[in-house]
Amino acid sequence: MNVSRRSFFHAVAGVGGLTALRAQVAGPGTPPLTFTPDAATKSTVAIVKGEVRRKMVADALNAIDHQIRPVIQRKKYVVIKVNNVSTTNQLAATHADTIWGILDYLQPKYKMPVSIVESSAGDTMEGFRNFGYVKLAADSAARNVSLVDLNAEAKYQVIPLIDFDLHLQPVRLAARLLDPDAYVICACMLKTHNTVVATLSVKNMVLGAPLHFAPKETPRWNDKRKYHTGIRQTHYNMLLTAQKLRPNWGVALLDGYEGMEGNGPSSGTPVPSRIAIASTDYIAADRVGVECMGINPAWPGYLNYCGQLGLGNYDIGKIDVIGAKIADVQKKYQMHADIERELQWMGEMKDLPIKLG
């Protein structure tokens, strides 16, 4: 029987997904791959359905305040990590009303400075201006809100990643996202992606942390490009970065008021999902987000890796969803045009060096 590449991927994705693919190379009796420290611990994810973005965001965070409070009370300031992969397309970027919703949640309870931060692929401050963050910060002067271009701040820690040839290469990660005094809030959206299937909270943190040259700096350099070394290497490097950032993650806020389908993360089309998702477990938040987008959860490799390594719960059976039900808010997002190539991380590697020993 002749099976096309398209038919193969759809068949595998529909029947067991990642498990089915791994079964081709795993011998009989191979134990499940998991490093979860406490398999009995469940995560809570709140889903709020509504029509007012700002209120939905605040309501989602308030729903899990009992989990946020014990940690944030030990911190000195709040970092809101936005997602401005584009500095000109609002659909691809965190909306100012999302930030307002976060501030509405924070201010009555937690009187501490707030820094809105980003390391955009382009000019970070251009995005801050275009999307209304500069006005927001000015209007919030009494709340001690500031804007920080992480590229211009130029403070970092170095971690090793792998390149296409599996050799080590250094990458500079924004130090502020690793500051133990900061309570880090991820403010992102529901979007499809051109490399890793879907981008939600983990992707926002992991690819927002690597820096590039500061404005007017020469010679130019860009550590974000080091993640685009190969479809398999990308997922693994994202895992390594998530592992480094994870101890400083506070709460993930996924703004699904208007998601993006098709050719995300910058050039897709809007989907009126009208939801907000919040959790102190970024991996669980993203699993619920993927479900709400109607995406096969086996497809985003980096999220499966993070779940296997115990960075959070990716198993839907270990997630308590409060508020709206997934089935009631789920929409089937159209995938990126390159989805077939994106899924090639799942199969066997064909061009490998010889085996020795």
Which sequence ranges carry the predicted segments?
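N-terminal and secondary-structure boundary signal
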Residues: 2-357
